[in-house]
Design a protein with these regions (language model features):
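N-terminal catalytic cores of peptidoglycan-degrading enzymes
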Residues: 1-78, 157, 173-175
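Basic/polar, cationic surfaces and motifs that engage anionic cell-wall
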Residues: 1-28, 92-204
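Structural preference for beta-strand elements that scaffold enzyme active sites
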Residues: 33, 81-83, 129-131
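A mature extracytoplasmic/lumenal domain signature
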Residues: 40, 66, 88-90, 134-136
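Short, well-structured alpha-helical interface segments that form or flank functional binding sites
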Residues: 47, 79, 105, 109
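Short C-terminal domain-edge/linker segments immediately following a structured domain
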Residues: 64-69, 82-83, 115-118
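Short coil-to-beta-strand
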Residues: 76-87
């Protein structure tokens, strides 16, 4: 199932499952996480692997009425986490974003979704709690207990089964693939920055 929701509805849903999400995460010895993905599909193809899908026009869809449900979105990191996906990037990779790159509407929508979900779960919007799949696959939150790195740029398993979702966005702020950038141009840095902007605007 999928259902379109507003930001206010989503925040209430996340608030209602806060205790359950925290309990799940703490059972794994960690705090809750929010993981950001692309679906590698078209702009309007919704996938049940993610709690939240954002279509090309920036609309927000949930695939479960219970955001504490464990979904299959981030290998060995699913328990006590929320999976959010942009419906885009079919055929995308490190050299290009495919025929459906992230839209401006999706980028702004996901930033607002991050703000609302993190607020409801009492999470700071930082890399310890909010990560792209690429960052998570590279253990950039410092948690090395889940798996070895399997990022596009750090395939420690050597099997080619790697991830780099949203490592770059194809925008002026995040124009190209550069996982070693320190200038704030990586996709995760841009999205967290935008989410904190929206958070600060709401609290002003």
């Amino acid at each position: 199932m999928s259902r379109q929701v507003t930001l206010d509805e989503l925040e209430l849903m996340a608030s209602n499952c806060r205790e359950a999400v925290w309990a799940e995460a703490q059972s794994q010895g960690r705090e809750p996480k929010i993981y950001l993905h692309w679906t590698a599909g078209g702009y309007y193809s919704i996938f049940n692997d993610y709690h939240i899908n954002i279509t090309g026009d920036g609309a927000i869809y949930i695939t479960s009425e219970d955001l504490s449900e464990v979904k299959n979105h981030t290998w060995r990191r699913n328990t006590g986490s929320i999976g959010i996906a942009l419906c885009c990037c079919v055929g995308g990779g490190s050299t290009n974003l495919g025929s459906c790159p992230p839209t401006a509407e999706q980028i702004e929508a996901v930033a607002q979704v991050i703000d609302r979900v993190a607020t409801a779960l009492w999470l700071t919007i930082d890399k310890k709690h909010v990560m792209t799949h690429g960052e998570a696959s590279n253990n950039e939150d410092g948690d090395n207990n889940c798996h070895n790195p399997y990022a596009w740029w750090n395939d420690s398993y050597g099997d080619g089964d790697t991830r780099g979702d949203l490592e770059y966005l194809g925008t002026s702020e995040s124009p190209r693939y550069n996982p070693h950038a320190t200038d704030g141009s990586r996709g995760g840095d841009v999205l967290r920055g935008k989410a904190n902007f929206y958070k600060n605007q709401r609290q002003a």
